[in-house]
Swiss-Prot record:
InterPro entries: ATP_synth_b/b'su_bac/chlpt (IPR002146), ATP_synthase_B_chain (IPR050059). F(1)F(0) ATP synthase produces ATP from ADP in the presence of a proton or sodium gradient. F-type ATPases consist of two structural domains, F(1) containing the extramembraneous catalytic core and F(0) containing the membrane proton channel, linked together by a central stalk and a peripheral stalk. During catalysis, ATP synthesis in the catalytic domain of F(1) is coupled via a rotary mechanism of the central stalk subunits to proton translocation. Component of the F(0) channel, it forms part of the peripheral stalk, linking F(1) to F(0). Signal peptide: none annotated. F-type ATPases have 2 components, F(1) - the catalytic core - and F(0) - the membrane proton channel. F(1) has five subunits: alpha(3), beta(3), gamma(1), delta(1), epsilon(1). F(0) has three main subunits: a(1), b(2) and c(10-14). The alpha and beta chains form an alternating ring which encloses part of the gamma chain. F(1) is attached to F(0) by a central stalk formed by the gamma and epsilon chains, while a peripheral stalk is formed by the delta and b chains. The gene is atpF2. This is ATP synthase subunit b 2.
Length: 159
């Protein structure tokens, strides 16, 4: 019986004690628990990944919706700006047309006033000339009557 034999016997006794103490079962249970824990962690990771993908898809959808809404807002603002520009242009054209019409009316009134003033001056001049010609050719009594008659005729034609 040499040392190898006694080492073998010690090994067999050690293995018997380990089996008697149910160490392989404890190791198996520990490994099974660890495997179950890893499976749960993997399942949680898979669930979290799916949720993250869903959130990412939702954020992409919301971003596209926000971009579309922003585009709609910009298009609406452009339409409103164009409408306001057209309205301002139309209002300006109407204002200019009204001002032109008013200026034309003032010019026409001024022309009429000028023509009336020239006519009045011409009448006054004609009356004065007629008066001086008649004064030279007619005596004083006839002069007064003739002048008054002519003045009455001119006044009746002007009114």
């Amino acid at each position: 019986m040499d040392a190898t034999f006694w080492a073998f016997i010690a090994l067999v006794i050690f293995v018997a004690i380990v089996v008697y103490m149910k160490v392989p079962g404890m190791i198996g249970r520990t490994l099974d628990e660890r495997a179950d824990r890893i499976k749960k962690e993997l399942e949680e990771a898979r669930t979290l990944r799916e949720e993250a993908q869903q959130l990412l898809a939702e954020y992409h959808r919301k971003r596209k919706e926000a971009e579309k809404e922003a585009g709609d807002i910009v298009a609406s603002a452009e339409r409103e700006a164009k409408a306001l520009l057209e309205e301002a242009k139309r209002a300006t054209e109407e204002y200019v047309a009204r001002r032109n019409k008013l200026a034309e009316q003032k010019i026409a009134t001024a022309e009429t006033d000028a023509i009336n003033a020239v006519r009045a001056s011409a009448v006054d001049l004609a009356v004065a000339a007629a008066g001086s010609i008649l004064a030279e050719k007619v005596d004083a009594k006839a002069d007064g009557n003739l002048f008054n008659d002519a003045l009455a005729q001119v006044k009746s034609h002007l009114n």
